[in-house]
């Protein structure tokens, strides 16, 4: 039979689901409750399309293609309908995509993943997670003001996890090793970048741009690299040799240093003319910047939003040159973020800055949820080193890291609710109710975790367990707005999912059912 999809005539066999016909044309149709080869459920309404003759919005997962159909797979009306469907699902979805500690970290480091790796004794892997976002882990582990610890949910139960000490340990272990870890680098781009300023912002910008394949040279008027880290931090708090070792690792990544060199207005213009990009990362008190013919405001150089680009030029700016900043982690984070913008500029892409994605958040835990989150943690208060200068021992690190509550989602990268909410710019608060569901975590099964507050009642897990004919399986319990998915008769997930556990975890469109 023949029908039209987006004004193109296509052929399809009788009885084929409309969604599959549209997908066969190469057009993606989002869906969260559709399970191929199983009876349709039509609960999420994210897969809607438009019937052109009638103008009706219809669910593509529950209709078979018919002769003569004329379908619009997506237009503004369809997008708005899908967005509304997602916002309704989000109104009852109680779960964080990223943990509060990660969100509050100016460098946006994946703190929960670092903690899990350290708790398992996977120190090398933990370092790799840290250095993905923090170029100077040993340094920052000693001097960071730790906004992440202020946001740590463990703090509301007893005391925050010692995140900075854990980060420091990962960095220190690398410095002690015979051969320090070096991140893989992209193929050389042939592009040359000057970074003016060897403080935390400049060091981070150069490090991450070098990893992206660009030839970087840091220019600084001082005899030593480090900027404010050398001048403003007590040597007892940050031993100079620790700072120098981490700077040397940045040099080992291919970054060149031209120290003891003053950059005046003429030199700056020469750099701009000669190179592919210039990063201004000078510290506080660099009054000469005002003569460099850059747009200025009362606090520093003017740059565009999160891209750190000066207008549409090849000049980018971060750190105190942008605005005064007291936190080393903040300017270091800016240097990392800036590297994405410079890389996009050098590759002649649209300059958008570091990619951001939708992030579900539900706020503070209520006391009734403390016990639920502690199920995946260990009891005991925060550990402190016997001698501050020496940090935590390996055994203490594993114990302290295990105090993490695992607030982030296990399916962070694959959650369809997150992916589609980002694609359709869904607003989590649009249909937000005054009261939210209480978070629960069921760990009875040895392979999966069930978090009912993240469930969108798509019915996929119910249909899969029906197929396996387990004694209990999963089913819908209750009626109306009170309905939940669970194991019948109050049985555990261990009894309900004897056969299909991993299959339902992999098929779940959110992080409600996930692998341990």
Where are these regions (language model features)?
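Positions that flank functional sites
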Residues: 37, 224-225, 265, 480
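Residue-level detection of beta-strand scaffold positions
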Residues: 193, 209, 216-219, 254-255, ...
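A Rossmann-like FAD-binding core segment of flavoenzymes
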Residues: 237-305
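Ferredoxin-type iron-sulfur electron-transfer modules and their immediate structural context
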Residues: 1-192, 275-301, 305-317, 321-507, ...
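Residue-level marker for well-ordered alpha-helical positions
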Residues: 16, 203, 241-244, 266, ...
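Hydrophobic pocket-lining residues within nucleotide cofactor-binding pockets
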Residues: 65, 225, 262-263, 321
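Beta1-alpha1 glycine-rich phosphate/pyrophosphate-binding loop at the start
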Residues: 109-113, 118, 127, 156, ...
């Amino acid at each position: 039979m023949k029908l039209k999809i987006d004004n193109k005539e296509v052929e399809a066999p009788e009885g084929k689901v409309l969604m599959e016909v549209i997908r066969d044309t190469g057009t993606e149709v989002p869906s969260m409750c559709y399970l191929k080869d199983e009876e349709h459920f039509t609960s999420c309404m994210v897969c809607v399309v438009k019937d052109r003759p009638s103008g009706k919005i219809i669910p593509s997962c529950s209709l078979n293609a018919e002769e003569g159909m004329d379908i619009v797979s997506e237009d503004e009306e369809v997008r708005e309908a899908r967005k509304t469907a997602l916002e309704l699902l989000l109104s009852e979805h109680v779960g964080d995509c990223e943990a509060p500690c990660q969100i509050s970290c100016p460098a946006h480091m994946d703190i929960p993943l670092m903690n899990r790796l350290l708790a398992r004794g996977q120190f090398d892997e933990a370092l790799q997670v840290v250095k993905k976002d923090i170029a100077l882990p040993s340094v920052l582990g000693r001097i960071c003001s730790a906004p992440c610890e202020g946001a740590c949910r463990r703090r509301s139960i007893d005391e925050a996890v010692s995140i900075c000490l854990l980060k420091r340990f990962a960095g220190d272990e690398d410095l002690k090793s015979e051969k320090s870890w070096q991140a893989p680098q992209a193929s050389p781009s042939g592009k040359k970048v000057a970074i003016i300023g060897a403080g935390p912002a400049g060091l981070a910008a150069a490090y991450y741009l070098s990893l992206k394949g660009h030839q970087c040279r840091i220019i600084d008027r001082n005899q030593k690299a480090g900027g404010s880290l050398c001048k403003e931090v007590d040597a007892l708090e940050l031993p100079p040799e620790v700072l120098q070792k981490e700077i040397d690792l940045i040099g080992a990544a291919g970054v060149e240093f031209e120290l003891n060199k003053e950059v005046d207005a003429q030199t700056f213009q020469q750099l701009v003319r000669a190179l592919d990009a210039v990063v201004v990362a000078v510290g506080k008190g660099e009054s000469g910047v005002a003569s460099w013919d850059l747009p200025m405001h009362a606090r520093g150089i003017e740059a565009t939003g999160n891209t750190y680009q000066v207008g549409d030029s090849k000049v980018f700016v971060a750190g105190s040159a942008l605005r005064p900043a007291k936190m080393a982690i903040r300017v270091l984070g800016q240097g990392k973020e800036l590297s994405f913008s410079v890389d996009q500029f050098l590759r002649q892409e649209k300059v958008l800055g570091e990619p951001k994605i939708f992030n579900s958040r539900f706020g503070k835990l209520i006391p009734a949820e403390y016990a639920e989150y502690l199920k995946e943690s260990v009891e005991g208060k925060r550990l402190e080193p016997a001698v501050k200068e020496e940090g935590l021992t390996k055994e203490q690190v594993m114990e302290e890291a295990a105090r993490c509550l695992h607030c982030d989602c296990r399916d962070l990268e694959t959650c369809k609710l997150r992916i589609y909410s980002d694609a359709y710019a869904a607003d989590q608060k649009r249909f937000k109710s005054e009261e939210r569901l209480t978070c629960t975590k069921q760990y009875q099964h040895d392979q999966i975790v069930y978090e009912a507050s993240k469930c969108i009642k798509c019915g996929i897990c119910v249909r899969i367990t029906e197929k396996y004919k387990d004694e209990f399986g999963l089913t819908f319990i209750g009626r109306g707005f009170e309905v939940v998915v669970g194991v019948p008769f109050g049985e555990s997930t261990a009894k309900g999912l004897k056969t299909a556990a991993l299959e339902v975890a992999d098929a779940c469109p959110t992080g409600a059912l996930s692998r341990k």
